[in-house]
């Protein structure tokens, strides 16, 4: 089974790119609440972003591999006023950047899917827990299940959240 964990609530800082945000300590209890829902003996991997690595540290005492390709959809801008509408544009037109400096969503899908394929191959028959990001997990689940990206689910993702896929 593949366990995709969206990171805990970040401490959002205007002027600082989201890839550098850390967890908001006020949300630690929400992260700890997921611990019992995750398999202790699984293979654990995380995005390199601080909020993802910090989430992993709160969820397991075991080793967690860091995989650069699990990072979120790359977004150079530190703050986008209409974030949800901009990401929805990325889903509607995945081959073009939805905002100046953003990675096309198709590139994110290809990068994350390749990385997860490698993890699953290396741990065939084992559970895997991956700590990462909402947009990346949404396109990954779409790819793994052969279904369109579930934008309603993406909008409803909590900090943290858990998606399971029989992979």
What residue spans do the PLM features occupy?
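Glycine-rich phosphate-binding loop signature in dinucleotide/nucleotide-binding domains
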Residues: 38-40, 119-126
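Domain-level recognition of soluble alpha/beta enzyme cores
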Residues: 145-167
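Short beta-strand scaffold positions
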Residues: 46-47, 110, 131-132
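Active-site signature of alpha/beta-hydrolase-fold catalytic machinery across serine-
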Residues: 58, 139, 143
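Short, solvent-exposed loop/turn segments at secondary-structure junctions
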Residues: 9-11, 50-51, 71-72, 134-137
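Phosphate-handling substructures
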Residues: 17, 22, 59-114
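Active-site-proximal alpha-helix that buttresses catalytic centers in soluble enzyme cores
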Residues: 1-65
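Generic beta-sheet signal
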Residues: 2, 42, 126-134
